[in-house]
Design a protein with these regions (language model features):
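Short conserved beta-strand and strand-loop elements enriched in small hydrophobics
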Residues: 33-42, 80-81
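Surface-exposed loop/turn and secondary-structure junction residues enriched for glycine/proline
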Residues: 14, 23-24, 29, 39, ...
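N-terminal assembly/attachment segments of tailed bacteriophage virion structural proteins
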Residues: 27, 35-36, 45, 53-57
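A broad, low-specificity signal for short, low-complexity segments enriched in glycine/proline
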Residues: 20-26, 41-45, 64-70
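Polar/acidic, low-complexity leader/linker segments enriched in S/T/G and N/D
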Residues: 1-32, 121-124
Length: 124
């Protein structure tokens, strides 16, 4: 098993799609039962979120990955992303997410938010 930490979302920085996640958007998010997917594909569940919390930078995630192939991708510096439902947003120059329902966390090759990355890996 491999464990990793990283940021699935970065606050107050526009992503490549023109979305901005604001502090507090994940205030109701819980780790319990949140899957880790490969490239947002529900058929490729590779682990589970152990803990998540908002800090000054964004949504910090710690997760366990059981998929042996995922360890190499993690160590290569995988990007992170998240699946969500919008609960509250403001539209303007950017779409600003004020409240989101977290569905999943994904390891991705090209994250919409380039700063959303795995920052530490331990284990196999």
């Amino acid at each position: 098993m491999t464990r990793f930490a990283g940021y699935a979302a970065i606050f107050d920085r526009p992503d490549s799609g023109g979305d901005i996640v604001r502090r507090g958007a994940f205030a109701k998010a819980r780790a319990d039962g949140t899957p880790v997917l490969w490239q947002h594909d529900p058929a490729q569940a590779i682990g589970w979120v152990e803990s998540l919390a908002e800090d000054a930078n964004g949504l910090r995630v710690i997760a366990d990955v059981q998929d042996p192939g995922a360890a190499a991708r993690l160590k290569a510096g995988a990007g992170l992303s998240f699946g969500y439902r919008v609960r509250a947003a403001i539209r303007g120059k950017y779409r600003e997410f004020k409240q989101l329902e977290l569905i999943e966390i994904s390891l991705v090759t090209h994250p919409m938010q380039p700063l959303a990355r795995v920052i530490a890996v331990e284990g196999n």
